[in-house]
Amino acid sequence: MQSFSLEKIEEKLKNVKLLVIGDCILDRYFVGEVNRISPEAPVPVFDLKETYFSLGGAANVAANLRGLKVKVELMGVVGRDEHGKILKDLAKKEGIGIKGILEEDSRPTTIKTRVIAQSQQLLRIDKEERKPISKNLEKKFQEIYEEILQEVDGVILSDYAKGMFLSESFCAWIVKEAKRKEKFLMVDPKSVEWKKYEGATSITPNYKEFKETAFKENLSQDNLKESAKILVEKYNLDFLVITLGKDGIFSYHPKEGAIYSPSQAKEVYDVSGAGDTVIASLGAFYAIGLPLKQILELANIAAGIVVGKIGTKPVYWEEIKNFIKENFKEKE
């Protein structure tokens, strides 16, 4: 870990404002116990003890930014339904700006329900509509996006392939408009079609997504540095970040070359939402001008903390600060 002042970082984070635009998801948890088998069929009987909701997808990216003391506006689509109302209420409770969350009558709010017993996930139930947003909604988003862009330092595009960016022309416009306004834009991709992300500051695939893109582009799936270099040049990126799960984070920057940061996870209970934490950390620490190596180290620490939590939960700056003080000697 490099020498840096935690107090200085915290002070700077409080002055940052970012926009998260993407697929908003509501996560619901059924928590209980399994102690017997059903007499009706050879399946376990789940005794429900608790139900709770949390922010997922792009909304979880926004929640992580709030945990890092960054001011946030969130843009995305929900259904005109009870789950959409719950998502917006949760976002407001976290201090997330929601003027960019629009409703669409023809689609339900995306909700993922996880059934958990004895700290283990037994089942996940998804309710979603995977279709592009309407042209009318696109137009409304464009108007709000141009307005919010003037207020923020940068943009995080969180693509979960649920509808926001299934229109390649709309996605490309989002990226180009940020560049035109000289705002950085980082992408957490779902698609292997990176043309729509061209010109972004960075793209942050996980290893599986990187391999799929490399395969499509006829590049080596094993030589990270060589393939990353080609992708950075082809898609006009400032740099590329690849998350490697338990193996940490890899980055390629044309001037700084390849940078590898090992994982800082102590215990892994649940990896859901870890990618959201990484992209939020990259955006927050990039916005305050930290060097890329230090940004990756902090993102790794943040990811290592959230995988030790059960369920989709954000990281908090205090947790990162405590981890560093316990595991590294901080030099002021």
Which residue ranges define each predicted feature?
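Positively charged, low-complexity intrinsically disordered leader regions
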Residues: 1-35
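A short, aliphatic-rich alpha-helical micro-motif
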Residues: 13, 149-150, 194-198
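Conserved phosphate/ATP/ADP-binding segment of small-molecule kinases
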Residues: 162-258
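Structural motif
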Residues: 19-21, 124, 153-156, 186, ...
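Short acidic, glycine-rich surface-loop motifs adjacent to enzyme active sites
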Residues: 152-165
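Conserved phosphate-binding/catalytic loop of the ribokinase/pfkB sugar-kinase fold
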Residues: 101-107, 114-151
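Substrate-binding N-lobe of the ribokinase-like
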Residues: 2-10, 39, 43-111, 323-325
